[in-house]
């Protein structure tokens, strides 16, 4: 921001004071927000307290930009647009920080003309430059082959999308190394919908061929820089009519943009298969359910909602912006275990007031966005740390009680937020376009209120899906009271804001609030490895686990033992079998043990602390070990000095932990689900939250949120295409607005199992003979790539040969130490892998099977992407996975 090098901000106190004071001063200048100067001072003090004590946080642009001019006199280049309160018109900024860009989310419209597309490109570049994201629906753009007014035919929407994608890839968002954030949407009835669905899938195939030819697999490398479609999230806009046609095995008609005549007709089932398969293979496109979105649209009188921001939480009219903020739910828990409803309401009231002031304080990239943001004033208040909140209260994430809590917290958030908006409207007036949307606004408010009265059995009124929920009465009463008052005040005063809430990802600001979980997400895993600024890693356990165990009634000693089971004691002191005393008796000195001890806090395997580099040659001699012995791939130092395998395993578990709570001492099995995470935990963990658990959570929250919920449904690598279709159908039935999925390892890969497919999607098998295994040998001359590696000082080479399409077909492994038993076994595994690949066994199946296989030698590697390997085979297959199955 051009902050001078002298006298920079050095504390959160300075940061929060700058932001809170600026908002207070601007609110006073605008008038109508505070009854007196004393009230304004109280507002500033309360906002500062909420920010400084991590009760809530604004979106990043507010922290980056707000108050730099007001507090420090810092100026920036002009060119944006803002609403001038004196002239009641949009003006162009001369100083970027007098009216800073405070919104993170933008939606921009685009019409079927070169002028509007060029203007969109210009405004997108400006948004990316200042660190914001934008989304657009390109369905108005005519399809390939449609006539042009001056003669000839259109090159089609995809040709323009490729151009927009190239510009987005050229701009580093906010001047950082992060790429631009962009959403592209196409309606299901667009004539180019099939090519659009396949766009990213086909481009990923090209990337795979380039990578196989030796180009870097890094996302910022030359291979991905060469292909298109890599700089946006892609979504398809799906109406109810398509979903009904799909469920009834019906047809789907596409229409030309210019004359509305019929274009190609498809089987709806075939189209859904393509959407699900593309998402299965490369995570795009996501889906947006159009009729659900329009049903909850507060401003139907102005126009329909066509698009969303890149993360799909801001869902509103074209050419509008939204400033976001999120509350930290954990901060509103009382010591008696109840939720502090009044404190939560007060924080909502303060933040909504602040965000409302920010609307006209801000500037925007185009004149139209500046005007429409002023006219509609949408806000995006949400929350973070839901996963931690539920864990602390002993509530499983995937449970009726967990969903009920999420629903009621969301209901109070929006109900009290709209209530505050109505109160402000009584003082300074409604948003300018309220009257033309009064009917639809009150209609949606009634939908929200009705949902609050059936929060214990949330259902989609149009589809019929429902969820059984369970929630404390005092929370239900608070939610219903807020919506009753909200509706009464709205009917009397109207509303100052057309929208009030979203559930954003909260990635950066969750760190500012010290949250263990982001947005609506559960915890990723109980144990994580935190990278240290000075190098190395530090093992941490979710801090909420111990507190949750205490709330469940476990004694302090039991909690300590459970935590030790998860993360290990991280020290030799007091460990079973292998400890300071037993190691000293073998010949280790205090100095030797200090070196080993220093590695244990971050080690996930005890053997990795007893390798050359940590144990020096002098120590080896004292132990009676010839240094040359350690070069043997089968060498295990702990075994060589007399420890039995069962002793090593017991010490490993005690010192390094299990990474999971499953099987922990004292823990009752009925409590396992409270600690379930998005992924399997540790080496022995088997539990994780199923995909439908994520879908049901989104569905429980959606009826109480103005916008949508930014959340990805994670699926395991083994998930099938049908699993994704089931997720989409269930989400639609439950009234979810937007949905994206990610299957682990889903980049340019093939299905793990045979799925029933329409014969128009791929050729139908003609006979049972075609089901017999067929070996596809490589051509005599083929391309290959060789990779040198080192595991615990043992050097080797991996050579991968490719088919003509760039897919791996053979693997050779060569260890520098020839003639050893391990070298022969590794050569056998390489031959076996080659034959399996040539018989069509998917590489991802082999990677999944052989990754993390543990035997000696193991230890540090020469590859920064795989810093530690549990064995040579572990390294080889993890490298194959990183190289050929993901970005």
Which residues does each predicted region cover?
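Nucleotide/phosphate-binding sheet-loop regions of phosphoryl- and nucleotidyl-transfer enzymes
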Residues: 187, 843, 851-853
């Amino acid at each position: 921001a051009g902050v001078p090098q002298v006298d920079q901000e050095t504390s959160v106190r300075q940061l929060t004071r700058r932001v809170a004071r600026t908002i207070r001063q601007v609110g006073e200048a605008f008038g109508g927000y505070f009854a007196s100067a004393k009230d304004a001072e109280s507002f500033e003090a309360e906002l500062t307290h909420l920010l400084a004590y991590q009760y809530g946080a604004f979106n990043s642009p507010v922290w980056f930009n707000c108050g730099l001019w007001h507090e420090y006199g810092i100026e920036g280049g002009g060119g944006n647009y803002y609403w001038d309160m004196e002239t009641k018109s949009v003006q162009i900024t001369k100083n970027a920080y007098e009216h800073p860009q405070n919104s993170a989310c933008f939606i921009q419209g685009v019409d079927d003309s070169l002028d509007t597309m060029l203007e969109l490109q210009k405004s997108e570049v400006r948004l990316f430059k200042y660190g914001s994201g934008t989304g657009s629906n390109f369905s108005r753009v005519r399809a390939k082959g449609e006539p042009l007014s001056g003669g000839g035919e259109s090159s089609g929407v995809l040709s323009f999308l490729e151009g927009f994608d190239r510009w987005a890839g050229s701009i580093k968002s906010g001047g950082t190394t992060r790429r631009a954030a962009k959403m592209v949407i196409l309606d299901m009835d667009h004539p180019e919908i099939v090519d659009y669905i396949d766009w990213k899938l086909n481009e990923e195939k090209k990337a795979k061929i380039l990578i196989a030819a030796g180009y870097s697999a890094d996302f910022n490398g030359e291979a991905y820089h060469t292909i298109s479609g890599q700089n946006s999230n892609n979504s398809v806009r799906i109406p109810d009519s398509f979903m009904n046609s799909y469920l009834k095995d019906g047809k789907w008609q596409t229409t030309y943009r210019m004359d509305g005549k019929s274009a190609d007709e498809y089987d709806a089932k075939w189209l859904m298969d393509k959407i699900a398969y593309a998402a299965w293979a490369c995570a795009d496109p996501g889906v947006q359910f159009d009729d659900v979105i329009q049903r909850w649209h507060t401003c139907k009188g102005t126009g329909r909602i066509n698009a969303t921001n890149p993360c799909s939480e801001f869902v509103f009219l074209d050419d509008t912006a939204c400033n976001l903020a999120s509350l930290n739910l954990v901060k509103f828990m009382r010591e008696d275990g109840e939720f502090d409803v009044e404190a939560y309401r007060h924080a909502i009231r303060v933040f909504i007031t602040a965000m409302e002031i920010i609307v006209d304080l801000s500037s925007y990239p185009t004149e139209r966005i500046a005007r429409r943001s002023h006219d509609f004033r949408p806000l995006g208040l949400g929350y973070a740390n839901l996963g931690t909140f539920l864990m602390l209260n002993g509530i499983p994430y995937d449970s009726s009680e967990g969903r009920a809590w999420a629903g009621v917290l969301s209901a109070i958030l929006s109900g009290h937020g709209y209530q505050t908006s109505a109160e402000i409207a009584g003082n300074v007036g409604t948003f300018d376009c309220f009257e033309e949307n009064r009917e639809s606004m009150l209609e949606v408010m009634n939908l929200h209120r009705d949902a609050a009265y059936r929060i214990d059995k949330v259902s989609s009124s149009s589809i019929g899906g429902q969820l059984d929920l369970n929630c404390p009465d005092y929370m239900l009463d608070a939610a219903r009271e807020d919506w009753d008052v909200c509706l009464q005040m709205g009917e009397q005063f109207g509303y100052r804001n057309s929208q009030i809430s979203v559930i954003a990802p909260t990635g950066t600001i969750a760190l500012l609030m010290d949250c263990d979980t982001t947005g609506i997400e559960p915890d990723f895993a109980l144990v994580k490895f935190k990278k240290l600024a000075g190098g190395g890693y530090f093992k941490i356990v979710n801090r909420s686990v111990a507190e949750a165990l205490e709330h469940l009634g476990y004694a302090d000693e039991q909690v300590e033992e459970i935590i030790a089971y998860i993360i290990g004691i991280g020290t030799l002191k007091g460990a079973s079998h292998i400890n300071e005393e037993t190691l000293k008796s073998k010949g280790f000195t205090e100095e030797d043990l200090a070196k080993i001890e220093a590695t244990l806090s971050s080690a996930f395997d005890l053997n990795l602390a007893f390798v050359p580099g940590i144990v020096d040659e002098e120590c080896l001699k004292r132990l009676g070990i010839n240094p040359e012995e350690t070069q043997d791939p089968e060498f295990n130092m702990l075994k060589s000095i007399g420890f039995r395998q069962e002793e090593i395993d017991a010490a490993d578990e005690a010192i390094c932990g299990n990474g999971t709570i499953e099987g922990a001492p004292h823990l009752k099995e009925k409590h396992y689900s409270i600690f379930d995470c998005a992924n399997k935990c540790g080496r022995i963990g088997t539990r994780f939250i199923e995909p439908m658990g994520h879908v049901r959570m989104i569905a429980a929250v959606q009826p109480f949120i103005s916008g949508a919920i930014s959340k990805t449904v994670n699926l395991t690598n083994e998930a099938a295409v049908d699993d994704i279709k089931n997720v989409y159908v269930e989400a639609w039935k439950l009234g979810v607005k937007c949905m994206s999925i990610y299957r682990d390892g889903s980049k340019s890969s093939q299905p793990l199992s045979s799925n029933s497919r329409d014969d128009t999607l791929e050729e139908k098998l003609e006979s049972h003979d075609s089901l017999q295994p067929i070996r596809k040998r490589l051509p005599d001359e083929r391309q290959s790539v060789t990779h040198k590696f080192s595991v615990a000082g043992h050097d080797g080479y991996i050579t991968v040969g490719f088919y003509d399409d760039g897919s791996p077909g053979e693997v050779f492994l060569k260890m520098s130490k020839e003639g050893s038993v391990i070298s022969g076994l590794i050569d056998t595994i390489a031959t076996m892998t080659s034959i399996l690949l040539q018989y069509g066994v998917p590489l991802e199946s082999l990677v999944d099977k052989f990754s993390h296989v543990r035997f000696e030698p193991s230890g540090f590697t020469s590859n920064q992407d795989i810093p530690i390997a549990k064995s040579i085979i572990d390294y080889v297959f993890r490298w194959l996975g990183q190289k050929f199955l993901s970005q």
